[in-house]
Structures are given as C-alpha cells and as structure tokens.
Amino acid sequence: MQSLQQQPNTHNSSPEKIILVVEDDDSIGSMLLETLSQETPYKPVLVNDGFQALQAVRSTKPDLFITDYRLPNMNGIELYDRLRRTHDFDDTPAIIMSAYLPEDEVRKRRLIGLSKPFEIDEFLETIEKLIQ
C-alpha cells in the first residue's frame, strides 16, 4: 500500500470535503476508499498508520477522521489525542473502528465507535450525520 492513496471522486461537490481514513489492513482500507469514492460526494484520503496521518494533516485539513483502533506505532485513540493537541482539530468529528473498542475511552472523548464488522449502510449514514 502506498503511504498516501487518493481515489478520484465521481461526485461533484463544492467545496470538496475531505475524509482522512487511517487503516493498516490493505483490504479494508481499499474497500473503505472505494466505498467512500463511489457512494459519497467526499474526497477520501487513505493512510495506513498514525504517523502518516499526522503528516497528511499538514497538507490537508480533513472534515472527518475515520481511524482503526489497532494501528502500528500508536492506536487510534492515541492518534486522536495527538491530533487534538498538536493541530487545530477540536471540532473535527472522528469515527473509531475496531472489533474491540475500549468503550470508556471512546465515551470520554465523545468519539463515534463502529464495531467491526459493520454494515456499509450504517457506516455511510454515520458519515453523513457527522460531516454535514
């Protein structure tokens, strides 16, 4: 997997909203990228670990973060905390995905948790509610 993948967006929206997806599993990342590109008017950007996410936010200001909980180098909650501390993302919504979610940590940070596996319709509805 490339360190930063972008999928051409087939929808037309102005200004284009950006979703940063942080997922280390290549097959899940590709599926999320394809789904977001085909089913939403948003521009998905895929990275596969927390450090790449921290670099990606320097060149783009995402309107939504979607991150896996279990990532190499730092987990999704640690990434969320670093983004809040080091960048201006206090109002940017975030979804954290995992088969195992530490519910107390998710609630404390007011994150939206999605348990894997999840239904694509539920995933897309959650995105629409958060990014409007």
Describe these PLM feature segments.
Residues 1-20, 119-132:
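Non-catalytic signal-transmission and effector/linker regions of two-component phosphorelay proteins
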Residues 23:
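Conserved acidic carboxylate
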Residues 26-45:
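Two-component/phosphorelay signaling modules centered on CheY-like receiver
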Residues 72:
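The feature encodes the CheY-like receiver
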Residues 97-98:
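Hydrophobic/aromatic residues positioned on beta-strands within the core alpha/beta folds
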